[in-house]
A protein has these predicted regions:
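C-terminal domain-tail junction helix/linker
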Residues: 69, 92-173
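RNase H-like DDE/DDD metal-dependent nuclease/strand-transfer catalytic core used by mobile genetic elements
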Residues: 1-120
């Protein structure tokens, strides 16, 4: 990605789904709170949130958000990324498979490709933690969804037309 660009990633540690991957030139605590509110509107509140100590995650906006929502927030110890190993592994995979491989011509293109990669990760890619099922399918089956429902996306995709550069396994472009 271009210098000065960042990606906010929100993961469900239980289902292994990537709930959001928001790219922008900067991300404030208020933006993080808005993203979390949107996720909670779709999925319900988590028991707690675990994050690193980034400035956007330790901001007054996030402190106010946790007070307003009552959701516990746990910060990993500084310099101890292994305390959030799944997230670190996911971010490394996103970086290796997409961010370091593409030359994005615009923020819009970056957003589309990241969303397409996220959909592939959630809906197509097998995960050993779920016996080879993709995270979305595993979540739907665990929730008792009918098998036919597990084949479709859990939420409408945000990206409309992925670039021909990134071709994930199994998702039509």
């Amino acid at each position: 990605m271009a210098a000065g660009s960042v990606v906010l990633v929100v993961l469900d540690d239980c289902t292994r789904e990537c709930l959001a991957a928001a790219a922008d030139t900067s991300i404030s605590g208020a933006r993080v709170a808005r993203e979390l509110d949107a996720i909670i509107a779709r999925r319900g509140p988590p028991a707690r949130i675990v994050s690193d100590n980034g400035t956007e995650l330790t901001s007054r906006a996030i402190l106010g958000w946790t007070n307003r929502t009552g959701i516990a927030w746990h910060y990993i110890a500084p310099g101890k990324p292994q305390q959030n190993a799944f997230a670190e592994s996911f971010i490394g995979r996103l970086r290796d498979e997409l961010l370091n491989e593409e030359v994005f011509t615009s923020l819009g293109q970056a957003r589309r490709l990241i969303e397409h990669w996220r959909q592939d990760y959630n809906q197509v890619r097998p995960h050993s933690a779920h016996g080879g099922l993709p995270p979305t399918k595993a979540r739907l089956l665990a929730a008792g969804a009918r098998p036919g429902l597990a084949d479709g996306p859990a939420e409408p995709p945000l990206a409309t037309s992925p670039s021909p550069c990134y071709q994930p396994n199994g998702l039509p472009s």
